Amino acid sequence: MNKEQKIIDVWMQHPNLDFINHDMFASLRRWMGIDKVTEEIPVEITVSAMDEGQVQKGLICAWWGPGGELISNDEVAASIKRFPDRFVGIGSVNRYKPMDAVREVKRCVNKL
């Protein structure tokens, strides 16, 4: 890769405890020999991994799945505030509640 090429990760999450301890990641935790993660992972760990992979920017995503919110829009906004030159945010909403979703999109655009 030459120095003029830029790497952008277009789908990333910075895991919080709800996300990493969710049942969908149970096999990953078993494979890693981890029963349950009990301490928050600092966002600096994600930035460090980006540095190691020569990723200049990441589109960091909130996550609202069928079981509810796992990574909030506010958490994504906090990561962007800490590292504005490294992250661009992608919000998430509860698609099963369309009016709440519209209000949340407006909140994200106007306040976050």
Predicted regions and their residues:
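Helix-coil boundary/capping segments in enzymes
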Residues: M1-L112
